[in-house]
Amino acid sequence: MDQLAHHYRAHIAELNRRVAEILSREALSGLVIHSGQPHRMFLDDINYPFKANPHFKAWLPVLDNPNCWLVVNGRDKPQLIFYRPVDFWHKVSDVPDMFWTEYFDIKLLTKADKVAEFLPTDIANWAYLGEHLDVAEVLGFTSRNPDAVMSYLHYHRTTKTEYELECMRRANQIAVQGHLAAKNAFYNGASEFEIQQHYLSAVGQSENEVPYGNIIALNQNAAILHYTALEHQSPAKRLSFLIDAGASYFGYASDITRTYAFEKNRFDELITAMNKAQLELIDMMRPGVRYPDLHLATHAKVAQMLLDFDLATGDVQGLIDQGITSAFFPHGLGHMLGLQVHDVGGFSHDERGTHIAAPEAHPFLRCTRILAPNQVLTMEPGLYIIDTLLNELKQDSRGQQINWQTVDELRPFGGIRIEDNVIVHQDRNENMTRELGLTD
């Protein structure tokens, strides 16, 4: 924790600098950042799992306590209004006592509806950042999630501080242990549901604590991009395993994917080819490179794999131009990663939030930025046998370029995705996932 404490001072200084800058531009007195409120299920007395506002947890690792507030102006010591009710029904959060508390003036709030007593008196000139606009209106905020402030903060969130990078390394380190446990469970005959339990136990986090719903897909289920069903029974024949799963550390996410074949076969060879391509793409990352160019390079590699593995005929550029590669690789190469799995700022050209759209032929690409130092991105090329997409090729002449016999052979395996989390440095790339132990 000493290293985090060392980096945290500079982290808070940078956040204060950003706040002071945007407040000066927008002639605002400060920001009031709301952690959020519980959401109750319809016609029930149970709340949905609480997820803190990412703008709130950017400042401090208070992740599970609703009704907290931050009052910041970039000059004075930030004020944390920490919710600690008198409650004999539920576990009440302890008063914070960690390395970060010295950087905040902490006030305890015992009743959520009394927060106005702790807020600035000239509230009309402060901006509210949060989800609950109705609460903000009642409290008197006239500026609620102003576009200029949000665009500025989102643009700069893509540049991680050293504190944030260390948190993300630790999130990767934790997730790697889960992936190794899940891989072992797969080869020992576990079902999807059982593999999930092995993963969660290894990372020491519940389903509500990991940053997103894990994808644990055996066999043809791997062709479903966001598969989260978790079958309880093991398949009669074990062919393949795709796992897309991360972990959290102090509010920062990791997002890692691996694919395994149960036996040595053509699908296993395809995994090896995809792994090689993914590492080559990561080697292409450097400051000044356009992320969409990396995505297009991925399609060239996928096209070559289609040719090499007798899935399609033709030439590389023709397979791309006709949209054939998009039927096998329909999603984007990756995205920004940080406080959110699909972190903000991936389309921001500048501090004003000028939007750079994804290429028309690749609408699912989640990042169009030019790479810069201290950005963290996922790199996750894939190749899948998705019948709904491949059937579209059958409707025209493109279907004649597909070797449907090979498609039929690979269909039971579902698909492949390999995903690492990479820090772009000025002079190198840091592949956190591989360097922390998930080498295959």
UniProtKB/Swiss-Prot annotation:
Mn(2+) 1 binds at D255, H335, E380, E419. Binds 2 manganese ions per subunit. It catalyses: Xaa-L-Pro dipeptide + H2O = an L-alpha-amino acid + L-proline. GO terms for molecular function: aminopeptidase activity; metal ion binding; metalloexopeptidase activity; phosphoric triester hydrolase activity; proline dipeptidase activity. GO terms for cellular component: cytosol. Mn(2+) 2 binds at D244, D255, E419. Its EC number is 3.4.13.9. Its cofactor is Mn(2+). Pfam families: PepQ_N, Peptidase_M24. Keywords: Dipeptidase, Hydrolase, Manganese, Metal-binding, Metalloprotease, Protease. It is an enzyme of class 3 (hydrolase). GO terms for biological process: proteolysis. NCBIfam families: PRK13607.1. Belongs to the peptidase M24B family. Bacterial-type prolidase subfamily. Splits dipeptides with a prolyl residue in the C-terminal position. This is Xaa-Pro dipeptidase. It comes from Shewanella baltica (strain OS195). The gene is pepQ.
